Every structure is written in structure tokens, then in C-alpha cells.
From Swiss-Prot:
Co-factor: note: Binds 1 zinc ion per subunit.
Taxonomic source organism: Lactobacillus delbrueckii subsp. bulgaricus (strain ATCC 11842 / DSM 20081 / BCRC 10696 / JCM 1002 / NBRC 13953 / NCIMB 11778 / NCTC 12712 / WDCM 00102 / Lb 14)
High-level lineage: Bacteria, Bacillati, Bacillota, Bacilli, Lactobacillales
A biological process term (GO) from this entry: alanyl-tRNA aminoacylation
Gene field: alaS
Name of this chain's protein: Alanine--tRNA ligase
Domain notes: Consists of three domains; the N-terminal catalytic domain, the editing domain and the C-terminal C-Ala domain. The editing domain removes incorrectly charged amino acids, while the C-Ala domain, along with tRNA(Ala), serves as a bridge to cooperatively bring together the editing and aminoacylation centers thus stimulating deacylation of misacylated tRNAs.
Entry function: Catalyzes the attachment of alanine to tRNA(Ala) in a two-step reaction: alanine is first activated by ATP to form Ala-AMP and then transferred to the acceptor end of tRNA(Ala). Also edits incorrectly charged Ser-tRNA(Ala) and Gly-tRNA(Ala) via its editing domain.
Cited NCBIfam families: alaS
Main location: cytoplasm
Binding site for Zn(2+): 567, 571, 669, 673
Amino acid sequence: MKKLNSSEFRQMFLDFFAEHGHMVMQSASLIPKDDPTLLWINSGVATMKKYFDGSVVPKNRRITSSQKSIRTNDIENVGKTARHQTLFEMLGNFSVGDYFKEEAIPWAWEFLTSPDWLDLDKDKLYVTVYPKDTEAHRIWHEVVGLPESHIVQLEDNFWDIGEGPCGPDSEIFYDRGQENNDVPEDDPENYPGGENARYLEIWNIVFSEFNHLPDGSYVEQPHKNIDTGMGLERVLSILQDAPTNFETDLFLPIIHATEEMSAGKKYGANKADDISFKIIADHIRAISFAIGDGALPGNTGRGYVLRRLLRRAALNGRKLGIDGAFLYKLVPVVGDIMKSHYPEVSDQAEFISKVVKNEEDRFGATLEAGLTLLDDLIDKAENSEDKTISGKDAFKMFDTYGFPYELTVEAAEDKGLKVDKDGFDAEMEAQKERARKARGNLQSMGSQDETLMKIKDKSVFEYGVYEEESQLVDIIVDDKLVDKADGEKATLIFDKTPFYAERGGQVADHGDIYDQEGNLVARVVDVQHAPNDQNLHFVDVVLPLVKGQTYKLKIDRARREGLRHSHSATHLLHAALRQVLGEHTHQAGSVVEPDYLRFDFTSLDPITPRELKNVEKIVNEKIWEAIQVKTTETDPETGKKMGALALFDGKYTDKVRVVQMDDFSIEFCGGTHCDNTSQIGVFKIISEQAIGAGVRRIEAVTSKLAYEYLAGRSDILDQIQAQVKATKVDGIQSKIASLQEELRSAEKQNAAYEAQINASKAGKIFDQVKTVGDLTVIATIADVKGMNDLREIADQWKSEGKSDVLILGAKSEDKANMLISLGQKALDKGLKAGDLIKSVAAIFGGGGGGRPNMAQAGGKNPEGLQDAIDAAVSQLD
């Protein structure tokens, strides 16, 4: 068996399949691109959906990758088991309609057992197969030579997630020996594929050969695929003879760095401490990679997952005696471990550390608030009949303040109290259900479109061309290939086209199609990419079109010009944001429409008005500098050396286009652009807002739309000038300031009048003193506007000491307010204003509360206000 470090093992896997004709694909971002069904990329195959469902045909149908992935469905098990992790790497080889079982199985065996590769002991390898998959069984036994005693048939070996591609699979297990088991040798689960620690699953090969239809039936797919997944960390634990994944070179440096910050704690000395070390090591890996790919802590979605991981790790740091923020110090350690294959963490270590430190500091304040709440919950439980902290309260401690359930239980037991575990579990399950619904179907896979996949005809988009003659090579009507289109709708493919197909945020060109006589035959309303990268023209048919004939394609020139303006302006905006806010700012999405753009980007903090103006100024300065826009076609590596900015979720083919505007902006981009920045004319930001945790959005207009926007604002300014009667535009501000001062003076005078009126009304109210028991009481509905007036009367009542109790109401058409104020005599009798008002507020459709000496409530049923006052008075005796 080879002794390899993590970098050597990862590279060996990729090299093996590269030698077998596979294209090595770089790991995709953890943040899914164009896939709303996924919260995170959670497997290697998650990045292959577009190939397996046929929406895109890869340049090479053989692909291999090492894909970083995140799964958080079993977060509570991380640290407690040998294998659970949130971040992991999935090694995989994939065939998109190329090879199948006859190649996939022997290759897996060769990589695992050949002396040239991993050289694992063949006697320690077992496989499981689906009972009906006799072909896989035969290959394992007859071709590979695996004895029958090492082949286990399991009904579970069928990969099926509902509608879409599915098929049998074969799992490979490594026997770690009974000495590493967690069940007795005679346990019924002690077999490959059972619940035990002896047989470690290291590789799964899925033979995707069927399509699961909506009616529950299965049909063979037109193209059979191979999808495999090997857990890098699991196999590494074998190669490094590590008891668990956490003793490999991927985790130990993080654990050792944590030891140095702890209060003398050592990994391996104490089981409880070991759990904390493992949780910290695992979580900081996931946190670092996720932030590096553009995610930021927040209250929803990915942001919530990050926040939860960070808090769990921080709490475990406290268990190890680490005070204050410390996780941010581990980010460079993670970067050093992974930089050979994933340089993004090391390259962004400063920014990632800053984000983590900020979040740790925030949690420090939250933690203290949580401890205060825990004390309140204990007091509440001590005064309850069942001496129990409710499950809902315990879950709030967990969910809002990051307190593990066990910590709440421990604190309760110290006081002789219990915690409602059933209630807690119910709240937890409800949250998981909400999360499941939010995630959607994490493994959803579309069905293959056989019609589009069969089309092999070339279809070339030609940059810089506005009209040209082209041959119609394919016609699709109602998902079928036909020779003639004479209905209302059709999809057309031409051998070459001036129409840009929607991609990279830029919407498609529109335009017209003419026959050789100059007759309009179709209007192009959309253009999209087919699986084999042809351009699909979606058209409204005007006159019949015939396959094989030549037509003139003519795009809407004005629309294209507007798109060029917006797309080039988007690049300038991206560069300006990075210049003003910092190079950690990443694009998080964009929409490019004619003379309008929407740009989403990552930012920890809100943008100040000054920063936003600076960004806008920089973009316009670059427009006025009349910079030549240079486009170069090259390979990705050369493009990167040129300084081209690669999007964190970008996947690039062998040939890429680099769009350059001097040294200010250099990006990979396949869109259409101006020849010179001066063609943009003018750039105007019309809105900026937060759209999610750490993600903000700018909307802007260019050229004609920018002029129209500014002209509209100028018209509004002229109207305001007329309304405030300013002699010129420059005088509007001073005129408004003068009007505001007049308004403040009038409001002040009005308030004085109202105070006099209320004082007069208060005098009449104070004359209505009556006795209830041994208390003097004023209880009435006052003829005032609302709560502010009631509070003024209460202040006057308090200063004059008119009675022991004041109960006032005020009502309007659809609202009611109530105020109760108690003097010292009433308080000495044990009365509490807050309790009184809570007991009667529902009578007038409201709710409220307050202090023992004063409370207030609001409601929506004014008709019930007098009854509520009477009910409050009745409780005084």
C-alpha cells in the first residue's frame, strides 16, 4: 500500500483517469451556479447535472474531478463519529454516454490495487451489487477476479431519487479489521454495507442507465452514464493508517494549532475534548472554503448555515478554555493545507479571517445575552409546577444563541430542573422540515432531451456581424425534428448566426428572418444554447420555412447596441467596486439588458453614499477616457496570466475570450461589448440595496436610458422649484430649509396649544375621582387623540397626586389605546399595572404590557374599550 499525503493522493487519482482519456475538470464553487435546487454543491455529480440531463454536451465525454462539497444534514454528528464532516472532497470519474460497466469496474480495481497506483491489499476489498445487476456481478467476478465471498448482493444498491436518471450501483469497501469495529463479530450488521466501523465504504460506482418516469415506470436512457464518488478523506485515512479522518494531514495541523490556543488541552487525552477539537477543525474548513467562494454569515440560507457552524465551533473553543475570538487565526492554517489544489483560501486568507473575526466578535455579545436568558429560563422553571424548561425555550437557546441542548440540560440539572426533550425534538424536526423545503430536491436531475441531444449540426455565432445569409439546418416543432415550419411557433438552427444566445447574464438578441425574395418569414423572440452548443432561435413564424434553404438573418441593431453599452459598463462597474471596496468584492450575479444592467456583488458592509458616488464617478471617467475595448481569444491559463478576472463560479472551456479595457478591467467574457468605452456615453446608478446576507445589488442605466433618467429627474427638479417658489434651481435647498424651519415653528406652537388643551381636559378628568375599596381611582375614556396624549395626562396626574390609580382610554374609528398608572398605595397592595392591562387588553382586541407602576396597550376594537376599563376597575377591590 502506498503511503501518500493528501496532495499526492488527489493528484494520483486525477492522473490515473487523465491517462484513460478523461478531461480533468477544476472544482466548481461551493455555491451552485444556475441551480436553485441546491443550497451547496454537495457531491461531484452535482456539477455534472447539465451533462447528464443532456442540456449541455461536454467537449470530452470522459471527465474526472476532485470536487469540494458541503453537507450539513448531520451536523450534530460531526466530531462524534470517525467520518462525519461538513466539508469534504469527492473524487470522481464520469462518463457522459461514453464508456460503461465493462470499463468503469476494471479501472476502479486497477487504481485501487495496481502497484503503480494505490496498491491496496486485494484481500481487504469487498463490493456490493444490486441483485438484478448480473452484468456488474459478472464483471467483478470473471473480469476482475474477485471471489464470490467478497461480492455481497444488496437490494439497496439502486440509486433512485424519483423522476429522472437512475440505475444500479456498486459500492467498494475496505476491511479495516475486527480490531477497528464497533460491533461484535457475530453481529448481524457486521458485513460490507452494514452498520459497522470495520468495513469502510470508499467508492461508489453508479450505472445510470434508466429514466424514472412520472408514472413510476422505468425506461432505458438514450445515453447511459457513469457517475462515481470516492471520499478523499476516507481513503486517505487508510493510506495514512489513521484511526479516523481527523488523524490525517488534512485535519491534524488545524487540531495542533487549536491545542496551542487552548488551556493546556491535548488531542487524544480526553474524549470530550477530542470532540471539540474535531468540531473546530471540521467547521473552520467549511467556513473558510464557503467564504472564499462568496458566501457570508447571515440569518437565512447559506448564511445561516455558516453562522451556525461558526457558533458551534466557537462554543467548543470555550470548552477547551479558549477565551475570545480564535477561529480566524486558523484560516491561514486551512489555506496552507489546501493551497496545492485549492489556492482560493490562501489567496483570500486576510479577507476570510476578517469575516470570521467579525462574526466571532458578534457572537461574543450574543453569547452573553444567551447566558442572561438562560438564567431567566431557570428562574421561570423554578417557579413552575413541573420544574421544567420548555422544549420551545430550550430550542430558542439552541437556535438563536447557539447553545447546544446538552448545555441547557446541564445548567438545568445543576438547579434540580428538567428540560422537555420531546418538545425540543419537535421544534428541531420542524426546523429541519423547513430547511428541507428551502433546499428543495438536493439531488434533482432533469431528464435527457433526446431530440436536442441528437442534433450534431454545427451552429456558429459570429461576433460583430449584424446580418448575414445562413442555411437553415434544423427545425424543431413540438419537440420533434421536422422539415418545414408553417405554424405559429418553431425553434430553428442555422449553420451560422449573428444572433447572440443568452448567456453570462446577457439577454439574447432579437430580430427578423427574411427569405431570398426579401419577405419577412419569422421574428426571433429568444435565442438559447442547445446541448451541443448550437444556437436555438425561438421564432414566431410569419411565412413557412423549409429546412436546407438559405435565409437572411438580421438582428435588432438598436437592441444589440444597448446590450453592448450595458455589458461593457458592467465590467467597468465591477472593476470600480473592487477599487473602492476592496479586491475581496466578487460578482454574485448579473443581468445585462439594453442600456440597463443589474449587478449583484459580495460586500460585508453597506456602501456609504460617498463610496457609491465614487464608484459612479470612476465608471464615467473611464467612459470619458475613451478606452479601446480589446478582445482576445486564448486558453484559460494564458488568460489568467494576462490578469483576467475569473469568476468564482466560472467554468472555462479550452478556448476563452478575454475582454480588456486597459489595465483597469480584464475579465473572461463571452458577451458582446463596445469597441470603445466612449460608446457607452454616460453611466448612472439608479438604485443600490442589500438583497441577502453579504450580497448587495446595483441597478444602473447607460446611454439613452441614462439620458432619459436624468432628464426625468431634471423635470421633477423644475416642478419642485415651481412648487417651493425658488427663483432658480440652486435656490431650492435654501428655500426648502426655510420652509422646514417655518414648519418646525408652527409644529412647536401647535404642540403648545395642544398641551394647554390637554391640561384643561386633564383638569376635568381629575375631577372624576371615585373610591374603590380603600383606593381612590380615576377611570374614564379621555377625549384625546392617542397614546402620546394619554402619557402626557399620566405625567400630570403623577406630579399632582390626584388619586391612587389612573385608568385611561382613548379611541378613534378603528383603534383603541389604554393606559394604567399606579401610585405607591396601589403598589403596596401588590397590584401591578402590567398584569392588570394584560388581563383586559383582549376585550378591545389588543395586547400590551409594561412596568408594575405603568403599562399601556393598543387594540383594534374601540367599542370594547369601556368594558375593558370596567374590568380593570373590578380587579382593584
